[in-house]
Design a protein with these regions (language model features):
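A membrane-interface helix-boundary motif in multi-pass transporters
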Residues: 74, 161-188, 373-391
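Intracellular juxtamembrane helix-capping segments at the cytosolic ends
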Residues: 117-131, 331-344
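Short amphipathic helix-loop junctions that connect adjacent transmembrane helices
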Residues: 19-42, 249-266
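Loop-to-transmembrane helix entry/capping segments in MFS-fold secondary transporters
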Residues: 39-43, 132-143, 263, 346-356
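Helix-to-loop junctions at the C-terminal end of transmembrane segments
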Residues: 58-72, 279-292, 375
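Structural signature of the two symmetry-related core transmembrane helices
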Residues: 76-91, 293-308
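Helix-loop junctions at membrane interfaces in 12-TM secondary transporters
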Residues: 93-107, 310-321
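Juxtamembrane intracellular "pre-TM" segments in multi-pass secondary transporters
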Residues: 1-4, 202-235
Length: 406
């Protein structure tokens, strides 16, 4: 249980990057305070996310292979990329509200995004080493803790520094110093909660993995006179992950521009949704074990919820459905990494989760582009609802994956 606790603490720490840096505070600061105008800022921020995703998708199979082939390689590389990610968060303190800092901010964000994805892939590869024998339970506890950790630090920052006219630490607002200082707190939060996993745990990782070219390993993993079982899972995951990207990146915009929610209402909805996601992960982790069924059932539930959101008319309908949707999306993602862990031999967990990262990132830009085109040509409701197509395709391919919990 000590290892599982350390595993969960890491998720508490690293959740600040996707939740606060990518989606909330840092992105808003860059778009509204650093960039020349919000439209340009949004485009540059999203472009950087796309570039980082493609680069890390191509690199992760190599990083994972290196982690497998060197004694204690997974732990060493996890430490390295975690430290780089933490440093990149802290460096946003130096980004002043001026267009002179656009390039520096984007470079820091690019490095931070890539190091986050690399560290997260290696973190996922540690699931078997850190969890109990019930991987569904271990993964659910870790994923749920990440949701709660993000909510806790976000609420603390909102109440003490971001929202009050006079923040608790009396940090001046000139030069947006109070917003820039938040990044120091985020970096410390990530560092503190990552220490147990990085320095108090030992991974079951030796250098026994045979030497094979990465390209050959990729082919053997996904293709053998047709798609392999693992290949089917990775392609299924690629499809429904792309659908989730449309939902997660578009739901805030949908709420403000279509439903008419205020920023405070969006923040409240985000907090409630993340609490719901944590509850879902904990309940599924404790009471369920068949991860393939969890994925299939939750995809169906999500399809219904997304359809409901796309036709919702009132703030109450929208927020209620968003909360319900996160309850199912959390366990869906948690069980996905359990399936990958069980389909991958113990001595190639690094490579396996390198491919897992690739499957979630390599085409992640396609869904938002198609959704954007449908939004432009028809409506935002149709564009948002397009995610249902990808979720359905992922569902049907997932049915064909042969899987038994181990």
């Amino acid at each position: 249980m000590k290892r599982l606790l350390a595993f969960s603490f890491y998720d508490v720490g690293n959740s600040v990057f996707p939740m606060i840096v990518v989606s909330a505070l840092t992105s808003s600061y860059f778009v509204n305070q650093v960039a020349d105008n919000p439209q340009t800022g949004t485009a540059l921020w999203q472009l950087t996310i796309g570039i980082a995703g493609i680069l890390i998708a191509l690199l992760m199979p190599y990083i994972g292979t290196l982690a497998d082939s060197v004694k204690n390689g997974r732990l060493i590389l996890l430490r390295l990329f975690t430290v780089i990610c933490i440093a990149s968060i802290a460096l946003f303190w130096f980004i002043l509200p001026s267009s002179n800092y656009i390039i520096l901010a984007l470079v820091i964000f690019l490095i931070g995004s890539m190091s986050y994805e690399a560290s997260n892939g290696l973190y996922n590869a540690s699931l078997k080493s850190c969890s109990t024998s019930n991987l569904t339970f271990g993964s659910g506890i870790g994923f749920g803790s990440g949701y709660l950790g993000g909510v806790i630090i976000l609420v603390i920052l909102l109440q003490t520094i971001i929202l009050p006219e006079r923040n608790l630490l009396n940090i001046p607002t000139e030069g947006q110093a109070h917003l820039r200082f938040v990044h120091i707190i985020l970096a410390l939060w990530f560092l503190i909660f990552s220490i147990p996993l990085l320095f108090l745990c030992k991974f079951n990782n030796t250098n026994s993995e045979p030497k094979t070219k990465v390209a050959t390993k990729i082919k053997n993993l996904i293709w053998n006179k047709g798609l392999t079982n693992t290949g089917r899972f990775l392609f299924a995951r690629m499809l429904y992950a792309d659908g989730l990207v449309i939902v997660t990146t578009g739901i805030g915009i949908f709420g403000t521009s279509v439903i008419g929610l205020s920023i405070k209402e969006i923040l409240l909805a985000a907090i409630l949704a993340n609490i719901s996601g944590a509850i879902g992960c904990y309940l599924y982790g404790i009471f369920f074990k068949n991860d393939k069924k969890i994925i299939l059932y939750n995809l169906l539930f999500l399809i219904v919820v997304v359809a409901g959101i796309s036709i919702s008319q009132t703030p109450l309908q929208f927020i209620s459905l968003a909360i319900i949707g996160t309850f199912f999306s959390g366990p869906l993602q948690s069980s996905s990494r359990v399936v990958m862990a069980n389909l991958t031999p113990d001595n190639t967990q690094g490579f396996g989760f390198g491919m897992f990262t690739l499957s979630g990132k390599i085409t992640a830009f396609v869904g938002p582009i198609l959704a954007g085109l449908l939004t432009f040509l028809i409506s935002q409701r149709v564009g948002f609802g397009f995610s249902i197509v990808l979720l359905l395709l992922g569902f049907f391919l997932m049915i064909k994956v042969n899987y038994k919990d181990t």
